[in-house]
Swiss-Prot record:
Assembly description: Homodimer.
Organism: Rhodospirillum rubrum (strain ATCC 11170 / ATH 1.1.1 / DSM 467 / LMG 4362 / NCIMB 8255 / S1)
Function (record text): Catalyzes the attachment of proline to tRNA(Pro) in a two-step reaction: proline is first activated by ATP to form Pro-AMP and then transferred to the acceptor end of tRNA(Pro).
Lineage start: Bacteria, Pseudomonadati, Pseudomonadota, Alphaproteobacteria, Rhodospirillales
Protein keywords: Aminoacyl-tRNA synthetase, ATP-binding, Cytoplasm, Ligase, Nucleotide-binding, Protein biosynthesis
Annotated GO CC locations: cytosol
Catalytic reaction annotation: tRNA(Pro) + L-proline + ATP = L-prolyl-tRNA(Pro) + AMP + diphosphate
Official protein name in the record: Proline--tRNA ligase
Predominant localisation class: cytoplasm
Amino acid sequence: MRLSRFLLPTLKETPSEAEIVSHRLMLRAGMIRQHASGIYNWLPLGLRVLRKIEQVVREEQDATGAQEILMPTIQSADLWRESGRYDDYGKEMLRIVDRHERDMLYGPTHEEVATDVFRKNVKSYRALPQNLYQIQWKFRDEVRPRFGVMRGREFLMKDNYSFDLTYEGARHSYNKMFVAYLRTFARLGLKAIPMAADTGPIGGKLSHEFIILADTGESAVFCHRDLLDKPAPENVDYDSDLQPLVDSWTSLYAATDEMHRPDHGVPEGDLVSARGIEVGHIFHFGTKYSAPMGATVTAPDGSSQAVFMGSYGIGVSRLVAGIIEASHDDNGIIWPDGVAPFDIGVINLKVGDAATDGVCADLYGRLRAAGKDVLFDDTDDRAGAKFATMDLIGLPWQVIAGPKGVAKGMVELKERATGERHELSIDSALAKLLG
C-alpha cells in the first residue's frame, strides 16, 4: 500500500479526552475515531490490526476442533426470559422493541442464542461433544465508557460455547480452551496469566480470567512470580489428557482481587501485586442454561439429559489496546510481528530522485511478491516527519532509502523494537527481511 493513497489521519498532539496510552496512541496513529460515547469507527490501520488478531484467534480455535458459526447481534428477549437472565443485566443491556411490539435486545453475550442453536439442531449424545464459536460485535451500555476501545460500549469478541454429555467431558472442553488461550495470547506477543475469577452474571462454579499486567489495568491482581516466565505450551495434542498441563499453571497462585485469599501461602518475595487488564475469560457452568432452556440429548440409556456447558470469551477489540499498553515507547506503538498492520515500512527520503524512486519501487515490489505486507511512504513530507510517522504506527521494520545511500547501493534497515539501525546492501536488507 502506498502511503499517498492510504487513509492515515495521524495527529501530532494528544487528544484531551484520551486518558491512557493505548487510547492516545490509537487516536494519534489514525487507527480509530469516536462515533459516539464508547463507540468507534475503525479506520484502515486499526482494522488491519483487528483482522490480524482475529486470524490468530481463529487459527487457535480451529486447532482445538471448535467450529465457527455466526449468531445475530439482535436477540429475542424471550430466550433471556427462558434462562432467567433477562433482568440480571439491568440497564447495561440495550433493550429494543420492534415494530410488532416484540421485545428484542442488542446482545451483550450469546449463551442463550448458542443454547437455542444447539437444542434445535442436536438431539443425540452421538453428536457430542460440540464446541461452537463466533467473532461478533456486542454491546453493553456502560455507565461511564472510558479508555477508548479498552472499555467501550460496542466491542468485538470471540465467544464460544461447549456442549458435553458428562461433567468429565465438559472439563476436558474447558481445559482445551484454557490451553488454547495460553497459546493465543503468546502468539499475540502477550504474557497472559490465568487467574481464578468470580463467575459474575454468567454463572457457574469454575472460571478463569486471562490477565495481562499493565499499570493502567482496572483490576488489582496477585500471582506467583514464577508465572511471569512460564512459557506457553507448544505442539499440543488436544485429544490427550490436558489436566496435568492445566494443573502446572493453576498450582501456582494467581487470583483477581475478588478471589484473592489472605492465606495464599506464597512467600512474600514471590508474590506479585499489580494491576491487570482482562483479555479473556472462560467459564464452566454445567446445566445452568441447558436445564431451564431444554437443551437435552438422548443419552445412551435412552433417557433425556441436559448437556453440560461452558463459555469462553476473548475481547478481540480490547486486545488491540492491550497489546499497545504492553508494547510502546515514547515515540509510539511497537507492534509484535504477528499483528502489525504492515510488516515493513519502505521510506523514500527523496521522492522525485530517479535512482531513489527506482530502488524504493523495486524494494516495494519484491517484498510484496514475497508475501510481505508493505507500507510504502512515497509522500513528499520531510524526512523527520516520515520517521515520526513510522515510529508512531509501530511497524516492526523500516527500510530507508535516500540518494547518498542508493549511490553506494545501500539502504538503512531499522528495527522498531530495539531502535537499531544498520546500513546494508539492498540484497542483504532483503535477505534479512525475508529470512
